[in-house]
């Protein structure tokens, strides 16, 4: 709904557009070039538009994305063919289309008969940037009035967690555990073990016992429990507490 600044302007300026966001050609191209039409691609590029308008150089610059995103080139080639077959009347149907139409000559390689510097790739890149900047200004000027493309709402699968690894020497861990328990018993029998060190040695024995169990599971290719994964994750902090000076 438009809002005239002064009451006397209402008859001239007042109006209602039932579908205020208008179709734009480049928005259609970008909608084709993102998820769900192109799996996992959530960020489009201005080069998509330039390629669809006929720029071979834009296609070269998109080569890595063509390899990364399945169906991207297929969708942009479809848009490119659609645009190539547009009639002059369609190009002239709106000022927006007409602006895009003016950019197409900038995207074509310069042939013989033109100055040699205009036939270089550097000149083609310069012209491609000119077209991109003009398109960006067009999009900026109409951002509130055009239907915007957007990627579908989805969730990216979480990265596979890396739990960590215990060197699988269960016998070593069990012998160390027995040594810790023997130390507790020996010092306790002589009344030489403080409560603090008893707690630390018992914690060490418990940790070594868990490492032995984890080692056996690794050797048997068995899945660890969440508790066992936590033992690996927080191993460093636990050892630090055991060894901390009292």
PLM regions: where:
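Polar/charged low-complexity regulatory segments
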Residues: 1-246
């Amino acid at each position: 709904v438009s809002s005239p600044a002064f009451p006397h302007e209402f008859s001239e300026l007042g109006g209602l557009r039932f579908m205020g966001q208008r179709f734009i050609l480049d928005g259609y191209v970008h909608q084709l070039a993102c998820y769900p039409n192109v799996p996992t691609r959530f960020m489009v590029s201005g080069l998509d538009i330039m390629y669809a308008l006929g720029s071979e150089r834009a296609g070269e610059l998109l080569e890595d994305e063509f390899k990364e995103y399945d169906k991207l080139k297929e969708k942009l080639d479809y848009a490119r063919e659609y645009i190539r077959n547009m009639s002059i009347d369609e190009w002239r149907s709106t000022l927006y289309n007409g602006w895009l139409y003016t950019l197409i000559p900038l995207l074509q390689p310069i042939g013989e008969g033109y100055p040699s510097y205009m036939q270089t790739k550097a000149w083609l890149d310069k012209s491609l940037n000119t077209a991109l900047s003009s398109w960006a200004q067009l999009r900026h000027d109409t951002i509130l009035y055009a239907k915007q493309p957007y990627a579908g709402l989805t969730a990216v699968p979480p990265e596979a967690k890396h739990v960590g690894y215990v060197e699988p020497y269960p016998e070593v861990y069990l012998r160390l555990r027995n040594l810790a328990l023997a130390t507790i018993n020996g010092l306790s029998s002589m009344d030489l073990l403080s409560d603090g060190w008893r707690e630390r040695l018992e914690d060490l024995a418990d940790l070594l016992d868990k490492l032995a169990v984890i080692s056996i599971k690794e050797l048997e290719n068995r899945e660890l429990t969440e508790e066992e994964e936590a033992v690996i994750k927080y191993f460093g902090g636990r050892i630090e507490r055991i060894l901390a000076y009292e």
